[in-house]
Amino acid sequence: MLLITSIPRRVVTTTQTDATKPLATEAPATPPAPAPYFQDGLEAARPSPVNLTGLGTKSAVAEPASVASAPPSSSGSAPVGPELLHLDAGWTPQGQGYDAKRDEVLTTYYSDEHDVLLSVQDKGSGSESLQVQLGGLDPKHPEEGKPTHGGGVSTDGEFVYVSDTRGIYVYTREELERAAKTGTVAQASQVMEVPFPEGVKDPATGMDLVSAGSYMTVKDGYAYIGSYSKDGDGKAGAVWRYKLDEETGSLIEDSRQGPIRAPDRAQGMTVVDGALLFTTGDQKLVYQPFEASADSFTANIDNRVDISNGLIDPYAQGVNIIDGELWVTYESGSEKYRDKLNPKYEPREHIQRIPLEDLDLAAACVTPEQLEG
């Protein structure tokens, strides 16, 4: 299997503010030269990744991760989610997906060598059931044309979708399990280039829009794909919507709808009932209502509001609503960012869980039930 052999696990029973640091890991092997890389946000030198050769004597699946308790919220005790297992091996977490049928949380990580690792964990125990390196379309050389950043991940249970700045990669669950079992790179069933058309404008303001696959989510037969943009650069990110093929899981390229203007510095996105929910680099949780039909996908950005209630930390990434809570993945616990974090915050090494009633839902005139629906 594609093995993270150097990460011993332990169970944490004490109450903590954020996350318990995992044990130190052995130095990874030097991998081959990296493929071209496209960044979503601010960059800096990254640490070397973990050895993914699959050669080793330990179990291919990590020991159960800790699920510790956070300080009480206004609604009572709010335990944190699964531990982000691969932080100390040089991996930086990005996307968060949720498989409701299996009660599993998916996390994508990128490494210094521009590899992308998919980790699948049990929602309750945090134990890792699958880890696999993601590749491209070529069955003989799947490492060619592979994703290099893995900014977003989502699943409908049968197919797993990964956004990677310039493309959307589709994998079958069957292929991911096969590759994990055999210690090989998972082969994509589809790689669709995200359009980079010139002259894309915000329909409401005429502002230039940046089109990329920085983050994504899927819901009710559609894929929603958004792009990151810096604050104050005179541009904004675009969010597109694509219909999914029911049989193959592929994105239907000529079904594109939009764009909707994304918030500045958007990093993660999920779809709730009639709205998009974004995490941003300036610690917001932006609620954006939209209108959609078989032929259109539009939104009035004047209706968007921040419902974070001050509960989002720096370096927020992927996001989902799970069992009446907002689950947020952070990159602040990674080797790349932990020393850059404002000292008033602790690096987050577990997924954050926020009860929906603790958010500023009144600002959006919604209830927890409406968000969860």
Feature map (PLM): residue ranges:
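Blade-loop segments of beta-propeller domains
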Residues: 123-158
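Beta-strand-rich domains and repeat architectures in extracellular enzymes and scaffolds
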Residues: 82-116
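Repeated scaffold domains used in trafficking and secretory/extracellular systems
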Residues: 90-97, 143-152, 195-218, 262-270, ...
